[in-house]
Amino acid sequence: MRGSTQGCSPTGREAIVLDTGAFIAGKAAALPGRLATPPRVLEEVRDRGSRSLLELLQSTGRLEVLAPSTRALERAREEARRAGVLGRLSGADLEVLALALDLAWQGCRVAVATDDYTLQRLAARLGLGVVRLRYRGAV
């Protein structure tokens, strides 16, 4: 994982990986603990309010922008292909899943913060937690 500033201990730390919806919904700042997001999510966050929230979280050190490993991206793609949903996922969605996998492989207890039902189901299939932002959710 490129850009990693801290790992997780064997006993685990909690980490929440944010998709674009966490910024658009304005919910990112209310989430507890370590927050992380991949670079492609930054590219998708365009509106002024969401962008301000993202930049505030980055500048205060609450949010880490981390690139997922190639290994984790391959695993996320493979699982999406098996589930028959690869065509429904954006590059940012795949990076969110892959980053969550990387953090889990480091020993973190990881959840993906998203309202995207496809992303929720894949996260659950991969043994990751899910944080719903505005809607009840698929899992």
From Swiss-Prot:
Cofactor(s) the protein needs: Mg(2+)
Domain called PINc: residue spans: 14-121
Disulfide bonds: none
Binding site for Mg(2+): D19
GO biological process: maturation of SSU-rRNA
Record keywords: Hydrolase, Magnesium, Metal-binding, Nuclease, Toxin-antitoxin system
PANTHER family: RNA-BINDING PROTEIN NOB1
Family note: Belongs to the PINc/VapC protein family.
Record protein name field: Ribonuclease VapC3
Source organism (scientific name): Aeropyrum pernix (strain ATCC 700893 / DSM 11879 / JCM 9820 / NBRC 100138 / K1)
